[in-house]
Amino acid sequence: MTNPGPSRHLFADVLARVHAVCSALVEEGALPAGLDLSRIVVEPPREASHGDMATNAAMVLAKGAKSKPRDLAEKVAAKLRADGLIDKAEIAGPGFINLTLKPQVWSDALRTVLREGDGYGRSAIGAGEKVNVEYVSANPTGPMHVGHCRGAVFGDALASLLSFAGYGVTREYYINDAGAQVDVLARSAYLRYREALGQDIGEIPEGLYPGDYLKPVGQALAAEHGDSLLKAPEAEWLPVARAKAIAMMMEMIKGDLAALNIQHEVFFSERSLIEGGSDRVAATIDFLRAKGDVYEGRLPPPKGAPVEDYEDREQTLFRATAYGDDIDRPLKKSDGGYTYFASDIAYHKTKFDRGFLNMVDVWGADHGGYIKRVQAAIKAVTSGKATLDVKIVQLVKLLRNGEPVKMSKRSGDFVTLREVVDEVGSDAVRFMMLFRKNDAVLDFDLAKVIEQSKDNPVFYVQYGHARGFSIFRNAREAFPDLPEDASKRAAFLAAAAVERLTDPAELGLLRRLALYPRTVEAAALAHEPHRIAFYLYDLASEFHALWTKGRDMPHLRFIINNDAVITRARLALVQGVVSVLASGLAVLGVHAPNEMR
C-alpha cells in the first residue's frame, strides 16, 4: 500500500486505510461483500501505553462476517502492519486493534500544522449545509442576567464551531414580544413614565418589574409624549409603552451581548407572526389541519393533578402523539388566543420555509419538558425533512470565594451579565461558561476566574499562548531573523529538523496537535463546544509540563544556545502549539494574548 503521508485529519486518514484493508479482504474473499463499514471508528486509546490509535473494525464486522472478532482482527492487523504509516498493529481484549504509528508521522503532522497555519483543524464535514442556531432569545423585559449568559456563550461558540467545520451558519434571536410578559413590561414602563412626570408612584406593585433599568424608558416616553398618555385610556397607552419598552430593552440586550462579543444576524419578532396583514400562526394551524394533524377534541385529565386544575372542554389540539410526544397539545387558550406552543410551531415553520433543514435551539434548564412537543411539531410541518436538536444549558451558580453573590439593585432581583463582564472580563466569562458540559450545573466563582494559577483554566490556556511568544522573544538572540508575523515565522520554521523531537513529552505534544482536527469534527457533530475547551486545557497543560521539565533538565529546554538544530525544531513545536491554541480560542470567542498583563 502506498504512503501518501498524513492528511490534515490524521485520524480520518488512518480510518480510510482501515476501510481500504477491509475492501482488500473482500476482494480476497476473506470478508463477504456488502458489510456496513460506517460503524468502524479510529480513536485515541483509553490508555496511552496501548499505542497511538485504536480501531473497532473487527468487533463491528465480525457478526456479518460470521467470524470470531479476534480471528478477523488478526487478518485486519496483518494488512495494517504493511501500511507505510503503521509501525505496530496489536490485538487487544475481545478484538480491538491498537495501532502505533511510525515516528515520522508525528514530525509530518507538525509540518502540516506549520503549513496550514490558522487553517489547521478547519473541516469540510458541513459541506456548506445551512444550519440555523437560535440562542439567547431572552424575553425583552430587562437586561441580560448571568443565567442568560451561559446560553448566549454556548450558542455563539457552537455557531462558530459549526462554521469552522464547514456549515453555513445563521445566528438567530427569537424576540418573545407577543406574550403577557410584555404587557407587564408596558405597565411597568408606564409607571416609570408617571414617575418621570413628577408623580409619586410609591412602592412598585407586586407583579410589575421593579428594576431601575426601566427609568430611562419612562423618561423617553415623557420626552416624546409629554403628559398626553396620562389622560389616555389603557387601550391607547399600552401599545405605545410596549413598543417603546421593547425597543429600548432590545437595544440594552444587544449592548449586553456585545460586551461578550456576541452578535446575531437575524432578530425574529414573535409579534410579526400575527401582525402585518397575515396571521402565520393561523395559516400554520390550517396547514396542519389539512394534513390531519390538528383536530377538535378533549384531553384526559393530567395524572395526579387536582380536578380543579383541569378544564374539561373541547380544544384545538395538535396530534403530537403521532410524532413521538406523550400527549396531544393545545393550540388555543380558553380565551381564544394562541398558545405559546402554536406560535412556536409557526416560528419554526418559517425556519423551514427559509431553507433550514438543520436547526439547533439553545434553551434554559426550565424548558426541558418542552423538547418532545416542538420536535414533534417540526416533524409534522416539514414532513420529516427537517431536524431540531435542542441543547439545554443548566443553571449557573454565581459565587465569590465560595459564597453566593448578592442580587443587583439595578436589576431588582438578579445579577446582570454586564456586571459580571465588567468585573472579570469577557474572556473569563466565555471560557468558563464553556469549561463544563452544557447540561451540568456550573459554579462560576468571580474570585477564582481571575486567579493567575493553573487552577484557573482560562488563565492557564491563555498563559500557554503567551508563554509561546515569550519563548519566541527569547529565541531572537539565537535567531535574530525569526519573523514576528505568524505565517512568516511558520514558514521560517518549516524546514526545521522536527524529527529530532523524540522525548516522550515532545511526542505527546505532537500527538495532541494531531488530535485537534478530529476534536473539531467530533465537537461539531455532537454540538458540544466544551470539547474544544477541554482540548485546549489539555494542550496547554502538556506544553507547560514540557517547559517545566526543561527547567529541571537543561537538555530539554526550548532554547539550547549551542545547538541551533534542536532549538529550531523546538521552536517549530512551539509555533504549532500557539497556532492551535489561537485557533481553538478563536472558535470559543476568547482572545489569545501574546503576553499576560
From Swiss-Prot:
Record flagged with keyword Aminoacyl-tRNA synthetase: yes
GO molecular function: arginine-tRNA ligase activity; ATP binding
Gene Ontology cellular-component annotations: cytoplasm
Keywords: Aminoacyl-tRNA synthetase, ATP-binding, Cytoplasm, Ligase, Nucleotide-binding, Protein biosynthesis
EC id: 6.1.1.19
Catalytic class of the enzyme: ligase
Position of sequence motif 'HIGH' region: 138-148
Catalytic reactions of this protein: tRNA(Arg) + L-arginine + ATP = L-arginyl-tRNA(Arg) + AMP + diphosphate
Gene Ontology biological-process entries: arginyl-tRNA aminoacylation
Transmembrane segments annotated in the record for this chain: none
Entry superkingdom: Bacteria
Subcellular compartments: Cytoplasm
Annotated signal sequence range: none
Family membership noted in the UniProt record: Belongs to the class-I aminoacyl-tRNA synthetase family.
PANTHER family in UniProt: ARGININE--TRNA LIGASE, CYTOPLASMIC, ARGINYL-TRNA SYNTHETASE
Description of how the protein assembles with itself and partners: Monomer.
Name the UniProt record assigns to this protein: Arginine--tRNA ligase
Gene of this entry: argS
